Amino acid sequence: SGTSMSATESGALPETVEIYDTTLRDGAQLEGISLTVDDKLRIAEQLDRLGVHYIEGGWPGANPKDVEFFQRAATELDLEHSKLVAFGSTRRVGGDVEDDVTLGNLLDAGTDVVCIVGKCSAYHVTEALRTGKDEGVAMVADSVRFLKSHGRTVFFDAEHFFDGYADDPEFSLRVLTGAAEAGADCLVLCDTNGGSLPSRIESMVRDVVAAVDCAVGVHLHNDTGCGVANALAGVVAGATHVQGTINGYGERVGNCDLVPIIANLTLKMGVETLPEGHLAELTPVAHHVAELVNFAADPQQPYVGATAFAHKAGLHTSAIARRRDAYEHVAPELVGNGTRFLVSEM
């Protein structure tokens, strides 16, 4: 929106960033994770306890489990803070939105918010979809317009955006502009292969924020080890919506980890993310979600790990006993963690 543009032009950060959790869809792609519908409902309750803005529940129609999840969520989930989102793709090549199965499934899921993924790279349109660029633009715009006509809030996940923009910026911007003009509520730029570094994320997000009159978000993966840094770079450039997963679960090496992203935005950058008083839920929720997916919590995870505020060296412990911030970058209680002293030979 115009306001976020002027904010970034003056170098100021956005006041608020929407946190969009995709643990239940993208996170579940991680090798070794297999979630039942019950698991997904329990995780959704934890995410609501944390207070994220959006919970992506799955892809209705992709499998029977996700259809069942949305049916049961409608009656069993009593969400206080979060909105449930159904995920799907744009209409198929040469198809008609009115009888498109995927779009129909999205509406049947009954959520107020939907997120659709579509190709935002000329190469993927011509090579993977084997269709023309005009049809690539139309597939996205038609789908957004159709879902908006049914009263939905619509997020557009611009697949392969960063690689596509590097290769053919004009086409990628055409797709985004078409989605915005069709009424998209947020354009989410996806680093689908996860190969981008923060400098590229920042400059490309800045370009898009300047070019479109629409909220811009980012969806990042951790293949370079820069998932969290990339998310922060996106916000610095004007993104007001971040998609990621709790504990960084996700395909290959994972999605960007919302746990340090939320903590960094709130504590280091002064950007509002969770409802007032909810930051202290970060540690218990991160650990609870780990339990629900049957993974051990990472003791070295920033902010919430068991050793994140554990002090072993004698010099550290004597200094910290006198003054906490001597060796702690934030007060651990802020994120629901605590200080620990370990016996050391030092």
PLM feature spans:
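Alpha/beta enzyme core
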Residues: I19, Q29-Y54, F70-L79, R92-V216, ...
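Terminal or standalone catalytic/regulatory effector modules within metabolic enzymes
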Residues: R42, V52-P64, E68, A331-M346
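Acidic, glycine-rich active-site loops and adjacent beta-strand->loop/helix elements
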Residues: G61, G88-V93, C120-S121, H160-D163, ...
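A glycine-rich helix N-cap at a beta->alpha junction
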Residues: E80-F87
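Glycine-rich phosphate-binding active-site loops on the catalytic face of alpha/beta enzymes
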Residues: G118-C120, V236-C256
